[in-house]
Amino acid sequence: IFSDLKLTYYLVCGSALGAIKYGGFIPWDDDMDIALPRDDYEIFIKEAGCRLPDGLFLQNHHTEASFPQIFSKLRNSRTTYIEKSISALPINHGVYIDIFPLDEYPADRGAQRRLEFEKQRLFLKLSVVYCSKKTGRAALYQHLNRLFHYDRHVHENVERLERVLTCSNGQRSD
């Protein structure tokens, strides 16, 4: 689909580390991680439903209301892989590939400060909801996932949250 639609995509996170440093997969990282620039991500989300072969399912908060994450997963519905953190949810639990949007970090210093302030504000607000030993972005994602599960009104603002959280951390994208 990426090739057919001429979409730009990247291998990221543990998948990129495994490919570069280990020449394959990292044993403790059991999924594949792909990221697309926001515009390409939106095209993929829009087109995937009618282009995916039988048995594959694009999972996100638009396709399954109970899905607790702010990115998408491409699931194989003919398989089962239970993630401990979401095992009780009534959602598709097939083997998956994580698909993340990448948002451009603003070039304007004022916009950068506002974005960083918004990230900090969200982090502080969410840290009150649930204390954790995790820090930084991992903690923020954990808190958002819990909010999605327990507090349905967060879905109303998910696009804004996605854009704040998927901007590169202090790096401007080209």
Predicted regions and their residues:
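Aromatic- and glycine-enriched beta-alpha-beta binding-site module
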Residues: 104, 116-118
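Conserved aromatic-histidine-acidic binding/catalytic patches
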Residues: 32-33, 87
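Conserved catalytic core of two-metal-ion nucleotidyltransferases
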Residues: 1-5, 48-107, 126-174
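A short secondary-structure junction signal
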Residues: 108-115
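Active-site nucleotide-donor binding segment shared across nucleotidyl transfer reactions
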Residues: 2-32, 41
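Non-catalytic, alpha-helical, charged scaffold/linker segments
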Residues: 121-125
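Short, conserved charged micro-motifs
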Residues: 42-46
